[in-house]
């Protein structure tokens, strides 16, 4: 689950980090009032969406008066912002953040952290190249990114943060401020179950103060039950409607741009299914994992979800029965096909627990389902069914 910038800054501030002060505004008048409240000569109006690249897309503007703040807010709120991280429709802007002007600054740094699956540790990253796309820095100048793996038994130690500060070229009071920032960020990361955290840029002001000018936080969705207050910050308007509906039925769904709908049990098998569809010349319309313990109700909802996509011209169902029984899946498929009134070809591959029984149920149903013998045969048949 992603947080908006203003939410991320509020959370980080509660852990002792110095952040760029700001006020969220849901309409142009509130934006104008926020400018006056901040009391500076300048302010920055930022569209609050769950996407990066806002500045390049026109979602970040410097304003010099309350009237300008009102005008910029009016141009953003109620519109969709399209950035390099969104699809063609963009993300809806329901609010803007009006933030204090912290510039000029002497330096812009980068600080971030992720759960590194290879090392199985929280890994911090820091760079002197703040204020730009960190992906470009990682690609073009990987040596400019410092990495610190944190031992989960002892946590981030002050000496590790100081070492990073020295390597970033900080000095004097800046070092202590950076250490406090990094330690506070780690504490927030662990206590709030972050999956990803970024401050870009982390600015060094002329007075030596270190301030978080931006904030990006992604929370581990599997841990949200432990954080009801954070869950209350969820903005469903920023989520894909189909993915949101899928999550309500405990389905793992990601919309893609192809025309072959996929229903699979198990993430690994789902990825392999998408790969082989591509190999045979097709394009998957989605990633959909119904889970290892799929129920009949969940399979029916998955079918509806796939066919809600107007781009889907064929469906491939690939089930390997382990915990889930193939005969139960077959019954759910029949029920779903009848309920949804399917008009596109449906290829079904069943293997494993009660696969033969499931295949017989499908064959005796009288429905025009296309059976497949093996994954390659399934991919070949679903691609050919498109004509």
From Swiss-Prot:
Binds 1 Mg(2+) ion per subunit. Belongs to the succinate/malate CoA ligase beta subunit family. SUPFAM superfamilies: Glutathione synthetase ATP-binding domain-like, Succinyl-CoA synthetase domains. It is an enzyme of class 6 (ligase). It catalyses: succinate + ATP + CoA = succinyl-CoA + ADP + phosphate; GTP + succinate + CoA = succinyl-CoA + GDP + phosphate. GO terms for molecular function: ATP binding; magnesium ion binding; succinate-CoA ligase (ADP-forming) activity; succinate-CoA ligase (GDP-forming) activity. The keyword Iron does not apply. Its cofactor is Mg(2+). This is Succinate--CoA ligase [ADP-forming] subunit beta. NCBIfam families: PRK00696.1, sucCoAbeta. ATP binds at residues 46, 53-55, 100, 103, 108. Pathway: Carbohydrate metabolism; tricarboxylic acid cycle; succinate from succinyl-CoA (ligase route): step 1/1. Heterotetramer of two alpha and two beta subunits. GO terms for biological process: succinyl-CoA metabolic process; tricarboxylic acid cycle. It holds the Pfam family Ligase_CoA. Mg(2+) binds at residues 200, 214. Succinyl-CoA synthetase functions in the citric acid cycle (TCA), coupling the hydrolysis of succinyl-CoA to the synthesis of either ATP or GTP and thus represents the only step of substrate-level phosphorylation in the TCA. The beta subunit provides nucleotide specificity of the enzyme and binds the substrate succinate, while the binding sites for coenzyme A and phosphate are found in the alpha subunit. One of its GO terms (cellular component) is succinate-CoA ligase complex. PROSITE patterns: ATP_GRASP (PS50975), SUCCINYL_COA_LIG_3 (PS01217).
